[in-house]
Design a protein with these regions (language model features):
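Mobile amphipathic helical/loop "lid" adjacent to a hydrophobic cofactor/ligand pocket
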Residues: 70-74, 78, 83-183, 195-199
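Helical element adjacent to the flavin cofactor pocket in flavoenzyme catalytic cores
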Residues: 191-241, 247-251
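N-terminal glycine-rich dinucleotide-binding loop that anchors FAD/FMN and/or NAD(P) in oxidoreductases
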Residues: 52-76
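Mid-domain catalytic core of redox enzymes
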Residues: 7, 232-341, 349, 353-354
């Protein structure tokens, strides 16, 4: 599999894309002694996981979190070095015009017990949730992934949860997790993600989510990653750059997001790609924090475009400069057709119903439109969770569209593809 000395190749393997999948693929290959070149079109590593610093505020490009319960996260990241900052256990639900806290009774017993008295849930729901938690935590992940596949709505109904907790918690929570308020996501994916929620914490690195790919890239040999190299086409054993250059290698891996992989590979892409689900994340600066805790707030009333909200420097003080204002992150489900000004107006109208007239004084800092936030993960999209990564004898593909649409899926996909190359 290694290239012959003096050959015409530029590397043993060329990887297109420096997101999590491409970086873990590169790390696995270089650890096995392969010479790798990673081509990245943008000015930094990370793909969709990037962080901008604006006036001292750290803005992740979209609302993103790390579940420390992800097995691959524990394998690939130095979690201590990331100085993770965690959200409060549980969530706050905007339900029938009031805020109601739903807490994990095993991590926050007092708040968890109070949750049972909330109109969002019942004692029976609490007991069913504990039983489900026990089921997924005491079943190996491979067995959870192999369970019969139904929609998440059918899974929740089959477990006997009440309509109140379905509408008041599961729907807005899954809208925030999968951009899927209709709960059509595969039950296999939902159970695996809930397993990770139950096993760990929901957190962000102190310096922003981009620290995840940066940490991986720092372990690669010097000059492995080449930024600003946009790939226009992928052939058999060669990569054509948009500037007219060509690089060659015995093996080429396309490690981009799904739509870009489909564009580069066309009908060669095994199984194609599922439609994407999108979101818009807006950042505001407020003089007073509307949520004076590290809470994730979800909307169950659906009276406007906001699905979830968090004050990021309540979670991670390092997301704002010292003595800075409250950094409010607001996200939608889907990418609305209206422009940022119209969307901002709708968001403010929605949140004024939550926090009052002070919302009018918030300053909008940024808006990120992310049409390809996640591949859809409905039952028909996932005949198997591990989709084919081999395109042909010289070309491979990896990314969250090959496994689950998550950080876990991207990391697993990159490693799985590298191991397939090494075994070929």
């Amino acid at each position: 599999m290694t290239r012959a000395a003096g050959g015409m190749s530029d590397a043993d393997v060329i990887i297109v894309g420096a997101g999590l999948a491409g970086l873990t693929c590169a790390l696995t290959l270089t650890a096995a002694g392969r010479e790798v070149v990673v081509l990245e079109a943008s000015d930094g590593v990370g793909g969709r996981i990037r962080t901008d610093v604006v006036d001292g505020y750290r803005l992740d490009r979209g609302f993103q979190v790390l579940l420390t319960g992800y097995p691959a996260a524990r394998r690939w990241f130095d979690l201590d070095a990331l100085e993770l900052q965690s959200f409060s256990p549980g969530v706050v639900i905007r339900h029938r015009g009031r805020f109601r806290r739903l807490a994990d009774p095993l991590r926050a017993p007092v708040a968890g017990a109070a949750s049972i008295l909330s109109p969002v849930t019942t004692l029976a729901d609490g007991l069913r949730l504990l039983a489900w938690r026990h089921s997924v935590l005491h079943t190996p992940g491979q067995e959870v992934a192999a369970r019969s596949q139904v929609t998440t709505a059918e899974l929740v109904e089959g477990r006997g949860f009440s309509p109140a907790i379905t509408a008041g918690f599961f729907s807005p929570f899954l809208a925030g997790t999968f951009f899927d308020p209709g709960m059509t996501t595969s039950s296999r994916v939902t159970e695996l993600v809930f397993r990770s929620f139950f096993q760990g914490e929901v957190a962000v690195p102190a310096l922003g989510m981009e620290q995840l790919p940066r940490q991986l890239a720092a372990r690669l040999p010097l000059d492995t990653v080449r930024l600003g190299h946009r790939v226009a086409a992928v052939g058999h054993g060669e990569v054509h750059l948009s500037d007219g250059g060509t690089l060659r290698a015995p093996q080429v891996v396309v490690a981009t997001e799904g739509p870009a992989a489909a564009e580069l590979l066309g009908d060669r892409l095994p199984g194609g790609v599922a439609p994407d689900r999108g979101t818009v994340t807006l950042y505001y600066l407020a003089d007073t924090s509307p949520v004076p805790r590290a809470d994730l707030v979800l909307d169950a009333d659906r009276e406007g475009p906001v699905n979830n909200l968090a004050v990021m420097n309540e979670v991670a003080p390092t997301y704002a400069p010292p003595e800075g204002r409250a950094l409010v992150s607001v996200s939608t489900v889907g990418v609305p057709a209206e422009d940022d000004v119209a969307l901002d107006t709708a968001v403010r109208r929605h949140l004024t119903g939550w926090y009052g007239a002070e919302v009018a004084s918030w300053d909008r800092l940024a808006a990120y439109r992310i049409p390809h936030a996640q591949p859809r993960q409905d039952v028909e999209d996932l005949p198997t969770l591990a989709r084919e990564v081999r395109v042909d004898g010289t070309t491979w593909v990896c990314g969250d569209h090959r496994d689950t649409s998550s950080i876990q899926g991207a990391l697993v996909s990159g490693r799985r593809t590298a191991e397939a190359i090494l075994a070929a």
